[in-house]
Regions:
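Exported/periplasmic ABC-transporter solute-binding proteins
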Residues: 24-31, 47-309
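Bacterial Sec-dependent N-terminal signal peptides
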Residues: 1-11
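Hydrophobic helical h-region of N-terminal Sec-dependent signal peptides
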Residues: 12-17
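C-terminal motif of bacterial Sec signal peptides marking the signal peptidase cleavage site
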Residues: 18-22
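Short extracytoplasmic/periplasmic juxtamembrane "stem" segments immediately C-terminal to an N-terminal membrane anchor
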Residues: 36-44
């Protein structure tokens, strides 16, 4: 295409020269016209070659990076992990990224043992985990939504009401201005990052009276959606229209409110490594560079999470 444009430009210049001569222009004016056209063509060729060189360099960089990255951990981070893996492998075809969703604590145990490169955790690391050499790399911020079944008329709860519900002090929705129906308290299993973060933020650690303890985010949402009077909690980015996300202290669970600090149920999404990022292999380092780039942040935002600086 560039060659065709170059030929057309030179033909046009020749035609203009002939026209000028026919109109009585001097041979110097005609020569100047041809020289200007040649300079334009040369500049266009140089710009095109520079663009091609940049594209080839980018492709070469992608082709040069190879290897595998293994992740395990939080079920709440499944959507993020899958999106990052897909986009990163598209950018670097020589890289394979695998992810297992076994729960935050299991992910931290795996990275501590060296059986995976990255342990995904939807809670902050504990001091004993850090003492074992695991480094907390926060890649995004997530909100935790309190969800009720769609027919529930109670749409707003205070922190004190949440405490009373989850400790079993409040047992009927009528006590909160709702229908005369028993409250069915749904939660996650022990070791879940979502459960740990929720209980810590609400102030009900090891004090919850659960009717059901489920092993995944999807299971909690499905149970609440199908159980009259149910209440549960789940990652904000996983909420769908089968449940109602309640406001807390009059504040809706939205990205804007979490960024503003007005919604109190939020937590970090951590991609933990054994040692600092700089100590990891080239492929793992490239993944973290990607997450910090504009392209990586777009992936994070695309799954409903809040990016970090």
């Amino acid at each position: 295409m560039r060659k065709s444009k170059k030929i057309l430009a030179l033909i046009s210049a020749a035609a203009m020269t002939a026209g000028l001569m026919a109109c009585g222009a001097t041979s110097q004016e005609a020569a100047d016209t041809q020289a200007d056209a040649a300079q334009d063509v040369a500049a266009e060729d140089a710009a095109a070659e520079d663009t091609t060189a940049q594209e080839e360099a980018s492709q070469d960089a992608g082709a040069d990076l190879s290897g595998s990255i293994s992740m395990a951990g939080s079920t709440s981070m499944e959507k993020l992990a899958n999106a990052v893996a897909e986009s990163f492998m598209a950018k670097y075809p020589g890289v394979t990224v695998t992810a297992e969703f076994t729960g935050s604590s299991a992910g931290i145990e795996a990275v501590t043992a060296g059986s995976v490169d990255i342990g995904n955790s939807s809670r902050a690391l504990k001091e004993e985990e850090k003492a074992a050499g695991v480094v907390e790399n926060v890649v995004a911020i997530d909100g935790i939504a309190v969800v009720v079944d769609p027919a529930n008329t109670v749409k707003d709860l205070t922190k004190d009401q949440l405490i009373a519900i989850y400790t079993g002090e409040t047992k009927n929705w009528s006590e909160l201005g709702g229908e005369d129906a028993p409250i069915v308290v749904i939660g996650r299993e022990a070791g879940s990052g979502t459960r740990g973060a929720f209980e810590e933020l609400v102030g009900v650690e090891d004090a919850c009276a659960y009717a059901s303890e489920l092993d995944s985010t999807g299971a909690v949402i499905a149970k609440v959606a199908s159980t009259p009077g149910a209440i549960g909690y789940a990652s904000l980015d996983a909420i769908d229209d089968t449940v109602t996300a309640a406001a807390l202290e009059g504040v809706e669970p939205t990205v804007e409110n979490i960024k503003a600090g007005s919604y109190f149920l939020s937590r970090p999404f951590v991609m933990a490594t054994k040692g600092e990022i700089s100590e990891q292999n080239e492929t793992v380092q490239a993944l973290f560079d990607y997450l910090a780039s504009d392209e990586g942040k777009a992936v994070i935002s695309g799954v409903g999470l809040i990016t970090v600086d």
